[in-house]
Regions:
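Non-transmembrane "mature" sequence context
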Residues: 1-153
Length: 153
C-alpha cells in the first residue's frame, strides 16, 4: 500500500508506508493512526528518527541539514531528545516521500538514485531538493504517483 499527501491507505497506519523503509520505526510512530501521527508530530518526535535516517543511509548529514533541520540544531536537539513540531512535520514529510519512492522503484538504491537525479519535470531540480517545502514535496508526490501509474512524465 502506498501513502501520498492527503491520502492514507485503508489500514490507516503509518506502518503501511513501506515494509522496506519501516517508516514507523524511523520516525518513532509505530502503528500510529493518522490522528496519532498528527498528535505525535505536534508533541515533537524523538530525535532518533533523524538518527535512523542517517544510519540507514537514506539521507546524508548535508541533506538532513538542508531539508529537516540544521546540523547545529540537530546537535542541540540530541541533548533534548525531541524535535520541535515543525521539525517533526518535516521529518514525517521526508519519510513519507522516501517510503513512496522506495515503493515505486522497488529498492532503496533505485529510489535513492532517482531522488538525487535532476529532472526536467521539476525544472532541473532533483526530487530530494524539492522536499524543503510542503509544495515541493507535493510536487514530488504527484510525480511519484504518475510514475507509479505508468503515466508519461
Amino acid at each position: 500500500m502506498r501513502v501520498y499527501y492527503g491520502h492514507i491507505a485503508s489500514r490507516k497506519t503509518i506502518l503501511t508506508y513501506s515494509r522496506s523503509l519501516r517508516a514507523d520505526e524511523i520516525s518513532g510512530m509505530r502503528g500510529q493512526t493518522r490522528r496519532g501521527v498528527i498528535e505525535a508530530t505536534r508533541q515533537g518526535l524523538p530525535v532518533s528518527g533523524v538518527e535512523e535516517l542517517l544510519k540507514s543511509g537514506r539521507l546524508t548529514l548535508a541533506e538532513v541539514d538542508r531539508i529537516v533541520l540544521p546540523r547545529k540544531t540537530l546537535s542541540h536537539r540530541r541533548k533534548i531528545g525531541r524535535l520541535t513540531p515543525e521539525q517533526s512535520d518535516r521529518l514525517v514529510r521526508v519519510v513519507r516521500i522516501l517510503a513512496a519512492a522506495e515503493e515505486t522503484f522497488g529498492s532503496q538504491d533505485k529510489a535513492s538514485r532517482w531522488l538525487r537525479r535532476p529532472t526536467k519535470v521539476l525544472e532541473g531540480e532533483a526530487p530530494l531538493e524539492m522536499l524543503d517545502t510542503t509544495e515541493g514535496a507535493r510536487e514530488v508526490e504527484d510525480l511519484l504517483r504518475r510514475i507509479d501509474h505508468g503515466l508519461a512524465v
